[in-house]
Structure formats: C-alpha cells, structure tokens
C-alpha cells in the first residue's frame, strides 16, 4: 500500500498515480469486466497476497499440572476458525519440559487481513513423555493431555498499545470444568518486511509518440508477476503531460507488495487516454534487485513492444532510467492502530421509495421473520463487525436519508434511532435495532441525495481534526438508487477529501450504478468540484452487491481492501506519526 507521491493534484491526468490505485486489465485495451473493488480483491489474493505478516509469541502462567512425579510439559497449538466453524491449524510451539509457566520461543506467523474477522483459537497440551523425541509437527494431539483453550480475534491483539493480550484458559479437562486452568498471553509483532519500502525515482527518455497532434502523456504501471495468473498491478505513477522524456515523482514499493527483491516486476509505460483505454508505449521486466543495480551502475533498460505474431518482441529506443533507489522503513497501518489511532464507524441508509414497501417480501427493506438478512442488514453487519474492533467506545452515528419522518417532512439526514438529539447507537446490534425501528416509523420517500450525510460525516471528522484526536472516520452509505444530487455529492466529497474520512458505498438491487463508479474515480481521475477544485485524494470505494462473485468474496472484503491504504495516504501526506513515535 506504499506510495511516496504526495502534494495537491492539479488535474485529472495527474491524479491517476499515487498510493496503489485499483488495478486495470493487463491487456492493452484495458477493459474491466467487474467492479474494480471486487477485481482488486481477487487479483491481490493470488499466490503472493499483499497482507502484513504477524509473528505471535506465546507464554502461559499457572497451567494445570497433569503429571504425577513432575510438572506438565506444555505445547501450544494455534488455529484459525473458518466461516463454517472448522479449525485450520496455523502453527505449533515447541514443547517445554517440566514447566507450568512456559515462555515459548517458537513464534507462530499469521497474515493480518484488515478486511476479515480472524478468529484465533489456542489449545494448550501436556505432551506425554513418550513423545518427547518426536517432532512437534508430527505429534498426534489426541494422544496428549488437553490443558485448556483460549479464543480471540487477531485485531483485538493488534489494537492493544503493547500488542499483548492475555486469555483465561477454559475447557473440559480431566481435572474438572471449574478448576483454574491458568492464562495464555499472546504478543504480536509485525515483521520488518511488512514495513520495508523501496523508494524509487523513475524517468524515461526517447519514448515513442502515440498521439497525432501532440506528444504522449506517459505514466508507469508496475505489476508483480504471479505464477498462477496475470500480473498483479501494485503501483502507478502520475501522468506527465505532453512529454517523451518524462520524470516522475518518487514511488514507494513495499516488500509485502513485491514479495522479494528477486521477484520479477513488469514495468509498463502507457499513454494516458481519458477513456481509460491507455495505449502501451513499451514494457520491460525487472526485479527490484535489478532496478537497484540500474541505479548503482547508472545504466538504462530498453523498453520492448510485444509481438502480435508471438515472435520476438520489438526492442524500442525508449529507455527506463532509475535516478534514485533508497530502502527505508515506514510506519505501517498497524503501527498507527496499536499506538492508539481509532477507526470510527458511521452508517447512512437509503429510505427512498424505490426500495419498495418494507412490508412486502419483494422490498429491499423487507425484514424476514426467519432471520435471513436483507442486503442492507448484511452490509451493516459485515462492515460493522470488522471496524468495531478499531473503535474503543463502539458508539456509532447512524442516519437515514430520503425518508418522510414523523413531522411529515422529507429528511436527507435523519437520526436512525428516532431521537431529536443524539445520532449515536451502541454497537453493530444497536444499528440493526435502530434500522428495524426506523422502517416502522419512517415512510419511504425521495429523492436520493448523498450530500447531506457526507456533509454530516465531514463535520464530525472536521471537529475531531480540530481537537487533534487520533481518529479516522469511515462512512458506509447503502443505497439502491440513482443520485439526484450528483454535483452536490461530488462537491461534498471533494471538500471531505482533506479530512480523515473514507466513504464506502454499497449498491443494492438491480439499478444501473454507473454514477457510483464515477464517484469511485475508477477511470483514474480524482473528483473535480463544480468550482474546478480537484479532490486531495480518492476517499470513495464502491461495490454493488450483485457484482460479488458467486459469494466467494463478501461485501466487506471488497470494500475494506483499500481502507488501510487510504488511511496511510492521509497520515503520511500530513506527516502524522503514530502516537509517541519519532519521525522516520
């Protein structure tokens, strides 16, 4: 999620680059078959995924003594609980002999995924003396004495300031269910590789001209070669207008993006087109190690153009030059979160008449007596259940828009809980209760306006910013309709782009959501207000429910994939460090 690009963007072409934009097709035509958020999720979850690696160190205190002539010989096993309830073993510690207060040395590594609720289950065993010379990975757990179990969510550990969580062990053991089974402590540490970045200054010379009446408008797209599928885009530069010898601002590639310094990277130079069909100028394949050598040896790499007849690629006169290569460590998303930064959740629900009468099963707002969630409930639950772990008080502002309230007027930002003052509810369950209550007390009306709820969220973020609060706000808008106030919404989003705020939009139903794709800046352009102001950064992420691939990826996974990157773009552009951390 790296990206050294910073500063105000003066135009749509320049706004294509920056912190890891959503990927486009690797073909020259650059056509996209699915929503960008969903595409990005699938492509980044290939053989070499892009998440932070976390090392967990375990220790225990006051374990149960199951041995007669000595103390227990404990070993810990960690599992990840899957959605269907199955336990997937992630790793085991070593066995420590004759010790009821073990401090295991063997670390267990797990990949942190912000967009998922990762439930960890820990089992502690007393390993029988007969198996002390057997490798721990081959031990049959059914042959060992069970000492207790602990469960937590990985984000619970990562949000602690010292990244340490202590669990009370429970479970049915032979000594009885009510006996004190001791505690298990988990300490998490993000690997250095997750924070290491390569900062690179690129320029090109002698590029081929692809335009008739002017020079090309080139930018670079860098992709990682993946063995099992097409290359995965990981970074783009800004566009340089009308220039065949362009020089770009520095880009940052994180080690978690490129895997290792020897991993092949495809570097494409493309001519920007406003249609989104960017034309390939040339490409080259280099690893990070090779880019470093180009810089040290002051050499250049020639671009090639793919042969349409599958023959030899055409070598071009255009060259890629690396003017500067520096490796450094940056603070990660988890550094900020564990230091005390919070993500504050807000939600806005569409109460326009196009949703259909909530009393009929065909309505998008229908509350099924069987407990089956409608699309609005599903989006609230999935997004809220992830973000709630990053909010200490779990008090969430919840609004509705496009509904006729009890006073007979249509409101585009009414409190979902029905209160005249105070828009907060407690927990995700509180949002669900307030939503169901509002359906009974608010009449569906219209039109569909976003600007009011965006302004309310921006006001909250602005107040927090003025108080120097370490908070970042996430507004979830769930809608079924076509926007009536497109210009007003764009203006509100451009104003909000300066604030610690991201806007997640879920489209429900079968409406044409082309407008939402425009808000999501999927063509590489940042939003431009009615007065000509360009958004400081892209703060919108959109996904339609119907575009989720056969249930293989949830709404929350597609929506939240880029949120840590948006957060980092904000804090890094303002040179904000984790609480108590020195500048680096």
Curated annotation (Swiss-Prot):
It is found in: Cell membrane. Keywords: Calcium, Cell membrane, Lipoprotein, Membrane, Metal-binding, Myristate, Plant defense, Repeat. Ca(2+) 1 binds at residues 67, 73, 126, 128. Residues 1-23 are annotated as: Disordered. Expressed at an extremely low level. Residues 34-167, 178-305 form the C2 domain. Residues 344-563 form the VWFA domain. GO terms for cellular component: plasma membrane. A lipid is attached at residue 2 (N-myristoyl glycine). Disruption phenotype: No visible phenotype; due to partial redundancy with BON1 and BON2. Bon2 and bon3 double mutant has no visible phenotype. bon1 and bon3 double mutant is seedling-lethal when grown at 22 degrees Celsius. Bon1, bon2 and bon3 triple mutant is seedling-lethal at any temperature. Interacts with BAP1 and BAP2. Negative regulator of cell death and defense responses. Repress a number of R genes and may have effects in promoting growth and development. May function in membrane trafficking and in fusion of vesicles with plasma membrane. This is Protein BONZAI 3.
């Amino acid at each position: 999620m790296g990206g050294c690009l910073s500063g105000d963007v003066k135009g749509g072409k320049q706004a294509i680059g920056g912190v890891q934009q959503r990927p486009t097709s690797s073909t020259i035509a650059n056509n996209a078959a699915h929503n960008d958020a969903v595409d990005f999720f699938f492509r980044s979850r290939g053989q070499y995924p892009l998440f932070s690696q976390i090392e967990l160190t375990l220790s225990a205190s006051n374990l149960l003594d199951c041995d007669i002539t000595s103390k227990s010989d404990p070993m810990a096993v960690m599992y990840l609980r899957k959605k269907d309830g199955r336990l997937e073993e992630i790793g085991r510690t070593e066995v420590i002999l004759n010790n009821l207060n073990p401090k295991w040395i063997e670390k267990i590594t797990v990949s942190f995924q912000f967009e998922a609720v990762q439930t960890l289950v820990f089992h502690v065993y007393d390993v029988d003396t007969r198996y002390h010379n057997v490798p721990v990975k081959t031990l049959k757990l059914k042959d060992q004495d069970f000492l207790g179990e602990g469960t937590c969510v990985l984000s619970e550990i990562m949000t602690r300031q010292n990244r340490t969580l202590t669990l009370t062990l429970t479970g049915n053991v032979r000594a009885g269910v009510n006996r004190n089974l001791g505690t298990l402590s988990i300490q998490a540490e993000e690997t250095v590789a997750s924070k290491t970045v390569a900062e690179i200054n690129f320029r090109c010379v002698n590029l081929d001209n692809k335009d008739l009446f002017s020079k090309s408008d080139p930018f670079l797209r860098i992709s990682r070669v993946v063995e099992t599928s097409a290359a995965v885009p990981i970074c783009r530069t800004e566009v340089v207008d009308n220039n065949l010898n362009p020089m770009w601002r520095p880009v940052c590639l994180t080690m978690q993006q490129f895997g290792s310094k020897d991993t092949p990277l495809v570097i494409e130079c493309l001519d920007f087109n406003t249609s989104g069909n960017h034309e390939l100028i040339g490409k080259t394949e280099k690893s990070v190690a090779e880019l470093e050598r180009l810089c040290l040896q002051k050499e250049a790499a020639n671009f090639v153009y793919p042969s349409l007849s599958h023959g030899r690629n055409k070598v071009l006169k255009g060259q890629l030059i690396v003017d500067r290569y520096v490796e450094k460590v940056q603070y990660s998303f988890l550094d900020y979160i564990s230091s005390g930064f919070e993500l504050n959740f807000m939600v806005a629900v569409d109460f326009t008449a196009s949703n259909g009468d909530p009393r009929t099963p065909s309505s998008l707002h229908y509350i099924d007596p069987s407990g089956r969630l409608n699309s609005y409930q599903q989006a609230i639950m999935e997004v809220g259940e992830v973000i709630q772990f990053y909010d200490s008080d779990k008090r969430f502002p919840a609004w509705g828009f496009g509904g006729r309230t009890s006073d007979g007027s249509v409101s585009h930002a009414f409190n979902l809980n029905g209160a005249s003052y105070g828009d907060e509810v407690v927990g995700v369950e509180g949002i669900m209760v307030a939503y169901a209550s509002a359906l009974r007390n608010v009449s569906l009306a219209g039109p569909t306006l976003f600007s009011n709820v965006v302004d309310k969220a921006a006001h909250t973020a602005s107040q927090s910013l003025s108080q120097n609060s370490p908070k970042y706000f996430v507004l979830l808008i769930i809608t079924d309709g076509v926007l009536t106030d497109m210009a007003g919404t764009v203006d509100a989003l451009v104003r909000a782009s300066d604030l610690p705020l991201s806007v997640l939009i879920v489209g429900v139903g079968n409406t044409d959501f082309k407008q939402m794709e425009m808000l999501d800046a999927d063509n590489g352009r940042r939003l431009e207000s009615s007065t000509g102001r360009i958004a400081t950064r892209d703060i919108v992420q959109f996904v339609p429910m119907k575009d989720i691939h056969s249930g293989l990826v949830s709404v929350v996974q597609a929506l939240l994939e880029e949120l840590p990157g948006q957060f980092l773009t904000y804090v890094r552009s303002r040179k904000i460090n984790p609480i108590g951390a020195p500048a680096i």
